[in-house]
A protein has these predicted regions:
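Axial heme c-ligation environment in periplasmic c-type cytochrome domains
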Residues: 66-75, 93-126, 131-133
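Gly/Gly-Pro-rich "capping" loops immediately C-terminal to redox-active cysteine motifs
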Residues: 37-38, 42-44, 48, 64-92, ...
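The canonical Cys-X-X-Cys-His
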Residues: 47, 51-61, 91, 105, ...
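Post-cleavage N-terminal segment of exported redox proteins
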Residues: 1-42, 90, 122-133
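Short low-complexity stretches enriched in small and charged residues
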Residues: 27-31, 44, 58, 76-77
Length: 133
């Protein structure tokens, strides 16, 4: 192999296996994945407004966290560790505390999958600005 990462095929296989397991778990639970509308172009500006209304009180107006919730401007939330679907699932189902000591996150009512896609686009844009890729 010339300059290619030999782990790449293994990583793709692991990702595929993980998605397969997730898919089976979702079917077993009778849940539907919260997905944005087909063709939606997530808008960071719209996401900023929604973030300020629904997320900033815990995750900080500056995305740097608060005494109630963790920062999104942190490597833990980079796309390779928390994919965009993780944001959708967190809003829909809540999250058990696993990286931080803030306690469990409850589901967030009143946000659609499209809203969450806009919020995620805003968070990702701010992460890129902060050098988190």
């Amino acid at each position: 192999m010339t300059g290619r990462n030999k782990a790449h095929p293994f990583c793709l296989w692991m990702l595929s296996a993980a998605l397969g397991v997730l898919s089976m778990a979702v079917r077993a639970e009778g849940m539907r994945l919260p997905l944005p509308s087909p063709g939606l172009m997530p808008n960071p500006a719209a996401g900023k407004v929604l973030y300020e209304q629904s997320c900033a009180s815990c995750h900080g107006a500056d995305l740097k966290g608060s005494d109630k919730g963790p920062p999104f401007l942190h490597r833990v939330y980079e796309p390779s560790h928390h994919a965009n679907l993780a944001f959708q699932l967190a809003v829909k189902n809540g999250v058990r505390a696993h990286h931080w000591q803030f306690g469990d996150m409850k589901p967030v009512s009143g946000l659609t999958p499209d809203d969450v896609a806009h919020i995620t686009a805003y968070v990702r844009a701010e992460q890129r600005r902060a050098g988190i890729r």
